[in-house]
């Protein structure tokens, strides 16, 4: 038997060997820290016996596969602990995930005290150091095996497998789990584990199924790494827009209004309106014409566009097709409406491109299980646009749409946080799309060439295109690592035909235009959530709902403070006065808690000299400055949308 290792060296053995024994032969130290192995490119257990010629790479916790196996084993330890403490609990699934693991159980909900007890039991199991033993059973025997153990969810999983499947299990002590693996050799290597939280989760992610109890945890080989991760999680919780946005009174939700229907509070409205005005002005500079179209339309419109056949389940339909003469639907997008704006008059080739922009309110019937804060909602506002262009204009206009998106991201300080994706059709499921394969392949190649010409790194995602065309999705991750699409730019060579759109070319012939569907900043609610988490509420000054707070040191200077505030307001600065009869130190601390960029402290000297004492979150105490100079500086900062660097960790 000949084994070629990752470094190119070879090991030869006279008889078959388990990978763990090969690891020991290489180094006892390596064997102690090994988690799994890569055998001819496939991740396998260390208990796997090999024979013949193979390429072998021993993987530790430092590798992704090693981490996954380590944490997957920890999830089995969690399940064993739960079964010991709650024998009535039924096990569902328990995979490793990024940064940890979870396990779903059919059982009562759990509080922090219960999680701590389970965690304590997990540590006992680790000390026992039970070996994990893998065995297999034919499908029918596997079903009977799990029925005897009264694990209905495991039975259901096995029943979904082919008749001739060989089912694998892992046993550790008294606990046995249905699992494909791979796993550690025993529970003993699990050093630093922590149960993070518990929540509800529908069986198989389907809200029609039973709600299970999901326990989240994580595991590391070193306590120091676990502590660092827990500190990171604490920071994430502080930044979570669903928590921080409510604390800052940017938005709220109310049960009687409904899931996915947030109330944007006055502070949040200020931020969204500033972004809207900026985007609308920028689009106007770039040649966009504004439209205002209805929030709903008859089903006839969506039947023409294809949305009725391909997207109806995502729409709010008003009426019953079997009973009502006319059925309406709230719009999930603006495109078909703007097509009729284009069609309202005949266009010549000289009139193109026609760039239409609208700040649109849209409605999408998202699953209740998908709702989360501002990132997944049922009603949202978006800077949507559609460009009707000649085929020879398509590449330039598409590039310009990318440039606009990049400008918006850069202005908001978000450009380093995004990834680009070419979302393609799935040729294995052509029924999901309209148009011929050649058109799809050509348009995808056009987008690919554009991204390469612009030197934009991107990944290609099969099956993520809309039903009428491929697109560029610009995505970002939230604080929990979940990726959402922030901006979309789509190439459409098909819908003009559906709507009989045309222009007259230089020969007098009717020609089909191409269409670009695009957003400049995407959904404002989702962007607000992104900004909250990015800046932990410490927004760039131009976006802050309150930009300056004037703090008189006593009631004697309230009039001067009001005068300062009025001058700021007259210059477009969002300023307030804290004229309460509180100590100045209290007022300063409260302004800092409210994340106000600038505090202007005024007393006798400031009043006499028409100055203010400036404290900023950027540099702390900046001393006295002339009021006119401060107004000039902050208005310039707001006008240029500058993102100032915070140079002090805490204001003194």
PLM region spans:
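NTP/phosphate- and nucleic-acid-binding module
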Residues: 1-90, 97-652
């Amino acid at each position: 038997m000949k084994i070629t290792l990752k470094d190119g060296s070879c090991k030869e053995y006279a008889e078959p060997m388990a990978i763990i024994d090969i690891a020991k032969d290489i180094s006892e130290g390596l064997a102690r820290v090994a988690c799994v192995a890569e055998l001819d490119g496939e991740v396998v257990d260390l208990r796997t016996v090999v024979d013949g010629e193979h390429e072998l790479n021993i993987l530790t916790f430092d590798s992704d596969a090693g981490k996954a196996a380590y944490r997957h084993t920890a999830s089995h330890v969690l399940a064993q602990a739960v079964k010991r403490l709650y024998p009535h609990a039924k096990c569902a699934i328990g995979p490793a995930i990024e940064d940890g693991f979870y396990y779903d159980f059919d059982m009562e909900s759990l509080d922090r005290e219960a999680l701590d007890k389970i965690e304590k039991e997990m540590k006992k199991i680790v000390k026992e150091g039970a070996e994990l033993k893998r065995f297999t059973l034919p499908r029918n025997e596997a079903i009977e095996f799990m029925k005897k153990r009264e694990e209905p969810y495991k039975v259901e999983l096995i029943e979904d497998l082919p008749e001739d499947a060989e089912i694998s299990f892992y046993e550790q002590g008294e606990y046995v789990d249905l699992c494909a693996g791979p796993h550690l050799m025993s529970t003993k290597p699990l050093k630093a584990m922590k149960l993070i939280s518990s929540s509800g989760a529908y069986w198989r992610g389907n809200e029609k199924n039973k709600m299970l109890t999901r326990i989240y945890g994580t595991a590391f080989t070193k306590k120091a790494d676990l502590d660092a991760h827990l500190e990171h999680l604490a920071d994430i919780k502080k930044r979570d827009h669903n928590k921080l946005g409510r604390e800052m009174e940017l938005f709220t939700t109310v049960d009687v209004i409904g899931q996915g229907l947030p109330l944007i509070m006055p502070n949040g409205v200020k931020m969204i309106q500033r972004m809207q005005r900026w985007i609308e002005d920028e689009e106007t500079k770039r040649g966009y014409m504004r439209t205002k179209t209805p929030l709903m339309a008859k089903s006839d419109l969506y039947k023409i566009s294809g949305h009725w056949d391909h997207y109806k389940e995502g729409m709010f339909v008003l009426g019953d097709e079997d009973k009502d003469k006319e059925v309406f639907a709230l719009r999930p997008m603006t495109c078909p409406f703007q097509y009729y704006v284009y069609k309202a008059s005949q266009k010549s080739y000289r009139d193109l491109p026609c760039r239409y922009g609208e700040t649109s309110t849209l409605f999408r019937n998202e699953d209740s299980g998908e709702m989360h804060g501002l990132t997944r909602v049922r009603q949202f506002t978006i800077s949507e646009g559609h460009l009707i262009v000649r085929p020879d204009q398509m590449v330039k206009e598409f590039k310009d749409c990318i440039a606009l998106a990049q400008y918006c991201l850069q202005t908001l300080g978000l450009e380093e946080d995004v990834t680009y994706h070419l979302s393609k059709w799935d040729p294995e499921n052509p029924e999901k799309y309209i148009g011929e394969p050649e058109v799809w392949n050509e348009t995808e190649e056009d987008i690919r060439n554009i991204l390469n010409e612009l030197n934009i790194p991107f990944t290609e995602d099969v099956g993520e295109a809309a039903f009428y065309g491929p697109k560029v999705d610009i995505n970002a991750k939230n604080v929990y690592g979940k990726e959402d699409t922030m901006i979309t730019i789509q190439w459409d060579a098909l819908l003009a035909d559906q709507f009989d759109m045309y222009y007259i070319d230089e020969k007098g012939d009717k020609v089909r235009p191409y269409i670009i569907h695009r957003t400049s900043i995407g959904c404002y609610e989702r962007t607000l959530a992104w900004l909250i988490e990015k800046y932990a509420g410490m927004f760039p000054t131009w976006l802050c709902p309150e930009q300056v707070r004037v703090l008189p040191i006593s009631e004697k200077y309230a009039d001067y403070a009001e005068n300062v505030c009025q001058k700021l307001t007259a210059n477009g600065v969002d300023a307030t006065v804290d004229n309460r009869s509180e100590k100045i130190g209290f007022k300063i601390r409260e302004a800092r808690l409210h994340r106000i960029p600038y505090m202007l402290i005024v007393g006798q000297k400031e009043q006499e000299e028409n100055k203010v004492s400036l404290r900023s979150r950027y540099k702390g105490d900046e001393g006295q400055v002339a009021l006119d100079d401060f107004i000039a500086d902050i208005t310039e900062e707001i006008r240029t949308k500058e993102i100032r660097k915070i140079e002090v960790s805490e204001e003194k």
